[in-house]
Amino acid sequence: MIAARGAPEIEKAKLRLEIAELQAVLNAKEQQLLELQSTISTGASNGGEPESKQDHQKLSNDDIARYSRQLILPDFGIGGQLKLKNSAVLIVGIGGLGCPAAQYLAGAGCGSLGLVDYDQVERSNLHRQTLHTVARCGLSKAESARIALLELNPHCHITCHASLLNRFNAMDIMHGYDVVLDCSDNVATRYLLNDACVMLGKPLVSGSALKLDGQITVYNYGTQGPCYRCIFPVPPPPEAVTNCGDGGVLGAVTGTIGAMQALEAIKLIVGLGDVLAGRLLIFDGSSCQFRNIRIRSKRANCHVCSDQPLITQLIDYEVFCGMHATDKDNPLQLLEPEQRITVVDYQKSLQDKPHLLLDVRAQAEFEICQLPQAINVPLAQILDGSYLQQLDAQFKSSGFPIVVVCRRGNDSQIAVQHMKNQFPEHFIRDLKGGLHAWTNQIDENFPIY
């Protein structure tokens, strides 16, 4: 019986070893492919400018065969295709918006594409960032997208900028392109791109998507087309900003908006149709309705695009906005140190003692995972006051300490700040770093999302 049980275990061990060896071979092949793509003439450089744009005067037979379905459009034709072939478009952010935008621009025959993204591919990206694959997890998003785009259209020149765009490198990177697409997911980058586009005289196709909703417009186009600062002179407070990582998004929504960004870029290059300048297109995915609303024209006293601008060079946009220029965790600092407790101290001093653990995430997130004994009270119920009386009664009857937790330690700070304003005498603490800190420091098997 012992031998019989041992045989399957040996076989399982052999299979695990074989899988590990195959994975190593796959990783090596991916690296070889990446190196090969870097050397081919249609590949990418990592320099500060797009590949040298050529003045193509005619289309090749391959071009005619490849782009025939758009060549026969009456308002497009040979002239429109040549304009695309001689154009260069910069896409900032190769995520949920940037992937479909890049895919359609490369497919349509855009001559040069610049891809800007500092980040690497992660599993949580794959449901919406459709240029990337499981095999390329850990690879630069710009490099991963380049591989996919060259497979789609090897005639497209692609320049990768695998770095974080900032005030020091933005002008050098952007100046060689005709159109810029803002596919980022943070406020600081939006202001940076806007100001740089105004200073360089380039149109900015701006898209955003969150949950089931999306928006798109074109800034800095035409004599009366506003820039981003005309609409939003002052950035919102950091605690009011929600990105895809915090609020969630459906992949098909980002695909819809990203494809429309590619469409607007093509229209700008070719001179096709009415450009979406001075208008905001709003997409409601829950009802599949589009609304097209008029937005204000240029602001006469705009700090960057007016006749007498106050901003004539790029500034520190992280300081200006009070938040990082990435879509990564953007930790708030709303509380004093004594109003917070680390996950290590919580486990040592409170977890096994009577206390009230409030999880202020939305119910859908609470159902994904939760700490033992946690009670789900969404942040909205604390801010609107509907739970405060019950909380006060619970504290007065038990005297138990109150610890507040959320996903990353931001919403919990907002909740603690609000509750302390109402009940300054109560023992209320924020669990610093939230559930992400719990996974990283206490229990690596606790789900992270």
From Swiss-Prot:
Source taxon at top rank: Eukaryota
Cofactor-binding details, from the entry: Binds 1 zinc ion per subunit.
Pfam families registered for this protein in UniProt: Rhodanese, ThiF
GO BP of this protein: Mo-molybdopterin cofactor biosynthetic process; protein urmylation; tRNA wobble position uridine thiolation
Annotated catalytic residues: C244 (glycyl thioester intermediate), C406 (cysteine persulfide intermediate)
Enzyme Commission no: 2.7.7.80, 2.8.1.11
Binding site for Zn(2+): C227, C230, C302, C305
InterPro entries: MOCS3/Uba4, Rhodanese-like_dom, Rhodanese-like_dom_sf, ThiF/MoeB/HesA, ThiF_NAD_FAD-bd, Ubiquitin-activating_enz
Positions with a binding annotation for ATP: G96, D117, S124, N125, L126, H127, R128, K141, D185, N186
SMART domains, sorted: RHOD (SM00450)
Rhodanese domain segment(s): 351-447
Annotated GO MF terms: ATP binding; metal ion binding; molybdopterin-synthase adenylyltransferase activity; molybdopterin-synthase sulfurtransferase activity; thiosulfate-cyanide sulfurtransferase activity; URM1 activating enzyme activity
Descriptive protein name: Adenylyltransferase and sulfurtransferase MOCS3
Upper taxonomic lineage: Eukaryota, Metazoa, Ecdysozoa, Arthropoda, Hexapoda
Gene expressing this chain: Uba4
